[in-house]
Amino acid sequence: MTDARGTPLGAATDAAGVSETMLGPAALADIPPCVALPPMVPVVADRAYDSDPLRGHLAGRGFRLLSPHRRGRVRPATNDGRRMRRYRRRYVVERTFAWLHGYRRVVTRFERMAELHHGFVHLALAFICLNRLL
């Protein structure tokens, strides 16, 4: 989870087989309470996050999910073109992932314990935040 400039706010890690929609609420819960977010902040995500339960969970926490709909969507579309213009700024999140992949220990998971890997991810994100500040 990043802000509009690409500064990391929170992260969630899990096994490779877990759906990304399950990690979204965990990444939001990882944002520290000292970060002041305005109400109804848009969360820009890719097509994998398009699920109605996740939209409901985010709306309950004061966020609005902006993601393109999946092709086989059964329910009617909830996005319009005006709000989806913000999806163009998705490159900011992808750029933060590229910065994170600059840390070899995070890219290849050498640790067997999930807590250690999660700690190294947070350490790499802290270094990214320091580089953004300096």
Would you name each region that the model predicts?
Residues 12-35:
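Active-site beta-loop-alpha junctions of metal-dependent nucleic acid enzymes
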Residues 20-23, 92, 119-122:
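Catalytic-loop motifs flanking and including active-site residues across diverse enzymes
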Residues 120-134:
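Charged phosphate-binding loop/patch that engages nucleotide di/tri-phosphates or the phosphate backbone
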